[in-house]
């Protein structure tokens, strides 16, 4: 027990046990659980507190096995609980890491896919340019070796990519010489390369605004590795547009004259050329050293490989050089500048060659700087940031540069296009410019469309504004063939006359969706009932307040038009039927109304044509062809350009123009056919042109013929349909003619060229008959057809 008691002393270091208390009678009472009681939570104390009160206090406290086991179990349970919490947190963090890694992988795949798309678009653009150049100039465009872009898989890239050597200056030199050779083949000179290199460096944020112009290796490494702090990135993005434009130093000497590039070249001293070359050396050397030290930097720069490999140059090869737009002192130059081994004589020779090329550019006018500023201002002051006027005056539109180069070198090589980011800063803002440059850059402005292609489409689009008619409404309530129809002069209202002895009024704005068709069904709002037999003809007054119908019962019914908003289930109104015109003795086949004198013309199978004034007590004013000298009339119409005359067609194949005042026939319109063929030359419909002295007739022999009202001679004849032409209508402007036929088709004709511009299959045949009537709306974009299938259709 002494060993146990002594060994238990080590337990005091783990937890402080409660002190024993002195109970009644001077004995110490242990806390619960000290002797194995159920409530014990820790080992008993080994020392007593207070003065000794009896012989038992001198003995040290003893531990019990149950108490120790209970303590161990308690601590083990607490440890397991903490471990479970830790496992849960660990699993959550692992899931978060996996999610972020998946997102990163997806973004990388998306980036690679976009780069591949860009390369394919570049390839397609070059092919289109070569094809256009060959079509325009008849010669092949020299673009070097035009090859399909190749894409290596990620596994191959990881395996085959060797680590960058420590001394890679030689590799940089060889690559630069090869790239310069490619650019010279495309037509790029060293001066343009210098300008574009400064441009790319500025857009990539590699410029430095320090006074001495030195680039520290640490700052360069931070820029390449994206190691700026979030605060620095925020400040960079929030720069005003003016600061962004000030970095485009190659625009400072821009001039309005046509010799801008020429003056710029002449104004560059030879010393500055050398200085610019030395700047490229320093930037490239520092960049190469950083690439060998940091593999992440090399991987980041590979994202811009598509800029380097573009065959048209685009100046992206200069993206490897870093520096700012300010001139550096010669004392600051690195002695490693000889790495590039630049031939000064070659540069001078190329500059002279470039000057000569710019001589032929004088005829090209550029956008005036003032006009450019006005155009930028017109884009909206509320949407654009404030830009100092000096910066605007120093800037040049990239599109004008592209136009100048295209005008000067169109016959020689591909047009040289400068980066378009300079103009973007006015419209997009500095942060958008930064994002666009670091994203797709100049490739975002690529297009396969040539400006000259728009002119090719002009002849093809000559009739682009011509309306194409499509079926919209189907009128289904008649029980037999619809013989005639007419539109209200102003409202979207239609009246139809049918062989079921009725006329129906339709409001096209009150529609019901059809069950199995894209068109809309319209229910009639009123039904006119007075005829004893089929209704054959129809006419509406010019004000739309009266309607006239002629039927097989030899009567002409005169109707007052109900309101377009009438309730279909209202009680019968007797005042709708205004009267009946009785004079004919056989079926009335044609009606025509003139709003000038409010007169009505009718032609009947009894051989007569009658002129009516419905308002008079004796409505029949005059009768024509009483002796049937010309045959049986089939159709009648007022002359559009001379309402004092009318034209009537006959079943003999001729048409006659009458003077309404004298009742005499003035002109006989005949196509001079033999009498034996007149039976097949039956005229079904005659209409007069609304503005020209021309009469148009529809014949049973599938022809449509045009006659001169003054001479009576036929001026044109054409086979218009596959079956008999039954109906004609001329639009209110006199531009188009619509014809209907028993071949189930409606055809729209251009009256100027006499050509069919649209054909619509509208109705089905019934007893070898199909379309009875067609009509234009006088003031709205509606046309309609009436058919033997008991349907009327409206097209819009």
Curated annotation (Swiss-Prot):
Principal location: cytoplasm
Tissue: Mainly expressed in the brain and muscles but is also detected at low levels in various tissues such as kidney, spleen and lung.
Protein name per its UniProtKB record: Striatin-3
Sequence segments annotated as region (Caveolin-binding): 71-79
GO biological process, one term: negative regulation of DNA-templated transcription
WD repeats: 477-516, 530-569, 583-622, 678-717, 720-759, 766-795
GO molecular function: armadillo repeat domain binding; calmodulin binding; protein phosphatase 2A binding; protein-containing complex binding; protein-macromolecule adaptor activity; small GTPase binding
Family: Belongs to the WD repeat striatin family.
Keyword Repeat carried by entry: yes
Coiled coil: 77-136
Comp. bias intervals (Acidic residues): 253-264
Modified residues (N-acetylmethionine): 1
Modified-residue entries (Phosphothreonine), positions: 150
Self-association and partners: Tetramerizes. Part of the core of STRIPAK complexes composed of PP2A catalytic and scaffolding subunits, the striatins (PP2A regulatory subunits), the striatin-associated proteins MOB4, STRIP1 and STRIP2, PDCD10 and members of the STE20 kinases, such as STK24 and STK26. The STRIPAK complex can be extended by adapter proteins such as SLMAP:SIKE1 or CTTNBP2NL. Interacts with CDC42BPB.
Keyword annotations from UniProtKB, A to Z: Acetylation, Calmodulin-binding, Coiled coil, Cytoplasm, Membrane, Phosphoprotein, Repeat, WD repeat
Purpose: Calmodulin-binding scaffolding protein which is the center of the striatin-interacting phosphatase and kinase (STRIPAK) complexes. STRIPAK complexes have critical roles in protein (de)phosphorylation and are regulators of multiple signaling pathways including Hippo, MAPK, nuclear receptor and cytoskeleton remodeling. Different types of STRIPAK complexes are involved in a variety of biological processes such as cell growth, differentiation, apoptosis, metabolism and immune regulation.
Organism: Mus musculus
Stretches with biased composition (Gly residues): 1-13
GO cellular component: dendrite; FAR/SIN/STRIPAK complex; Golgi apparatus; neuronal cell body; nucleoplasm; plasma membrane; postsynapse
CDD domains (alphabetical): WD40 (cd00200)
Calmodulin-binding: annotated segments: 166-183
Membrane topology reported for the UniProt record: Peripheral membrane protein
Subcellular location: Cytoplasm; Membrane
Modified residues (Phosphoserine): 202, 214, 229, 257, 334
